[in-house]
Regions:
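N-terminal subdomain of nucleotide-sugar transferases
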Residues: 1-63, 250, 408-411
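Carbohydrate-associated surface elements
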Residues: 41, 178, 199
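A short helix/loop element that forms part of the nucleotide-sugar donor recognition site in Leloir-type
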Residues: 50-58, 206-219
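Nucleotide-activated donor-binding/catalytic signature segment of Leloir-type glycosyltransferases, i.e.
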Residues: 259, 265-293
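Conserved acidic donor-binding segment of nucleotide-sugar-dependent glycosyltransferases
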Residues: 343-344, 348-355, 364-370
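A short, well-ordered alpha-helix in the C-terminal region of glycosyltransferases
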Residues: 357, 364, 371-386, 395
């Protein structure tokens, strides 16, 4: 069985970002299947080229996975219009790359950005193969709610494209139970939808590690370290974290660590400087393989999003990493991910945007280390049982088997 995936933001463990698709692909390859991934030659988080090649398409091999890197116009930290240009450049060149992959049995697209899903649909039509569409975020709803997409004509076109792809897909895969409900509400038959939620490989994280090397490097010895790991964009509500840090400026034992990059990073660093925050450190993005050590150096972790109704539907990847690392989550996101944290007993929920409540939660955990550790242990146990990436890879293989009619099982 040969799976072809078109995914502009695909990340390997050597890059920052989520590695869901790498982990699924690796386990398929280990089981004797073939996987080709058409990806951008730009990291979506850093904007750096991931290949040294100068052509439009560069071939790599990663743990037996064939990765075809397609040239993408750079648009990091630029306007929405330039980002559309970047998406369109990948959409066009990815089709050419996909047609170089040889015979395939299934074509998979993933959204957002929705344009790469168009590429996957077109390749599936040309190859006369089933088309599996993965919905990772509800686009364009998120873009509309954030205020990034405002033009009525573009919104109408986006809605039409969304409906077109839902109809044309052989099957739909979602990573949050709320997305399944959303699609059913859009008229997609329930039997056409499969749920494989975001999750984590627990073996990547050692809950007993304490990250002594990084604590020394970042001068965090003796501190209660509260880490946010992820994008620094408009949606992520980092200003709430900075306001909480401002409230805790006199709590010398508490330090906030912001790990990541994004369009708002420069503005956020300027804001922290203007506030005179000496209890906040920005360390930039880190490759996935380094995140175990980063989280080991942390005592508690943060997940924040703006208080927008659509964000109540999402399962943020970072939360599952926090759980597997055995660290409690201070969660300023309502909805389905709150249900996970509360079911696990793995953290504290605070209302989105409420910096006072966030600061109170930090103090609560810093002053009761036994409670904090117990929450982290409960979080890891829950993630291992319910969100184990190895079990999810087996579910993914079974889904492919149903769609293709070929054995694609993983151990």
């Amino acid at each position: 069985m040969h799976l072809l995936l078109i995914h502009q933001a695909f990340a390997s463990p050597n890059e920052p970002g989520g590695t869901r698709h790498y982990e699924f692909a690796r386990q398929l390859v280990q089981a004797g299947q073939r996987v080709t991934i058409v990806a951008s030659d730009l990291s979506y988080l850093t904007g750096q080229r991931t290949t040294a090649g100068r052509g439009l398409i560069t071939r790599q091999e990663l743990d037996g996975i064939v990765v075809l890197r397609a040239y993408t116009y750079p648009a990091l930290h630029r306007s929405f219009a330039w980002r559309i240009v970047s998406f369109l450049s990948f959409m066009v060149i990815s089709v050419g790359a996909a047609l170089r992959a040889g015979p395939v049995d299934l074509v998979m697209g993933t959204s957002p950005p929705i344009f790469q899903a168009v590429s996957a649909w077109l390749v599936a039509v040309l190859r006369r193969r089933p088309f599996l569409l993965e919905v990772r975020d509800l686009w364009p709803d998120f873009a509309i709610d954030i205020g990034v997409l405002r033009n009525p004509v573009l919104i109408a076109l986006s809605r039409w494209l969304e409906r077109f792809l839902y109809r044309r897909a052989t099957h739909l895969l979602v990573n949050s139970p709320a997305y399944r409900d959303y699609l059913i509400g859009k008229g997609v038959p329930q039997e056409k939808i499969s749920l494989i939620p975001n999750g984590v490989d627990p073996e990547m994280f050692d809950p007993e590690a304490r990250g002594e090397r990084l604590r020394a490097e970042w001068r965090l010895d003796g501190k209660f370290v509260v880490t946010y790991a992820g994008a620094l964009g408009l949606a992520n509500d980092i200003p709430t974290i900075l306001r909480a840090a401002d409230r805790l400026r006199d709590q010398s034992e508490v330090h906030f660590l912001l790990v990541g990059d994004g369009k708002e990073r420069a503005n956020l660093e300027a804001q922290a400087h203007q506030l005179g925050l000496t209890n906040v450190t920005f360390v930039g993005s880190r490759p996935k393989f380094e995140m175990a050590e980063v989280l080991a150096a942390s005592d508690a972790c943060l997940a924040t999003l703006r208080d927008i109704p659509m964000f109540r539907t999402t399962y943020p990847n970072k939360v599952f990493d926090y759980m597997a690392a055995g660290r409690p989550t201070i969660l300023a996101i309502d909805g389905v991910i709150r249900q996970v944290i509360e079911a696990a007993g793995g953290g504290i929920f605070v209302p989105p945007g409420d910096d006072a409540a966030l600061a109170t939660a930090v103090i609560s955990l810093s002053q009761d280390r036994a409670r904090s550790r117990a929450m982290g242990q409960a979080a890891r146990a829950y993630a291992v049982e319910h969100f184990n990436r190895r079990q999810q890879a087996a579910q993914f293989a079974e889904l492919i088997e149903r769609l293709v009619g070929t054995k694609a099982r993983v151990a």
